[in-house]
Amino acid sequence: CTHQQINNCYFTEVGNEDWGCLAIAAGYVSDINIEHNEISEVPYSGISLGWGWTQTVNCMRNNRVHANLIHHYAKHMYDVAGIYTLGSQPKSYVTENCVHSIYKPGYVHDPNHWFYLYTDEGSSFITVRDNWTEGEKYLQNANGPGNVWENNGPKVDSVIRERAGLEAGYKDLLNIQ
């Protein structure tokens, strides 16, 4: 997929029957823009961007995850993050998102293996900047070159937290039952 937009959507209570589902999963993509979404009450991670556990440059590039609000995630699974990346993605950005309130189910195999932001194997050439998280629990696992991590955590300007999620014209989605 190329040049796709996932903007101003509300994802909640997805994956109730298949706990391995994500709210947004974008595998081998380029020029995708995922912004101003709200994700809550999901069994696993909120957003997964990329695929292929390799540092080899491929079709994935120019991707953007921006100003999303992700909360109350990982209801049933661990090895998770609010935002998770995998594989080489030159000129890709994870910026100005707000991630908080992870569930802590007692039956997961490793109760400490959860993160707010997680760049997994082969994640390369990705900038992770200005994301508000309620703590500084991140994982950079077997990453490749060129990643930039700047100004993430609870000390990020509160304006970023307030602007994340649905834009004003889409807030009525929160009232749909």
Residue ranges of model-derived segments:
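Short glycine/acidic-rich loop motifs that flank beta-strands on beta-rich extracellular proteins
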Residues: 15-22, 43-49, 58, 70, ...
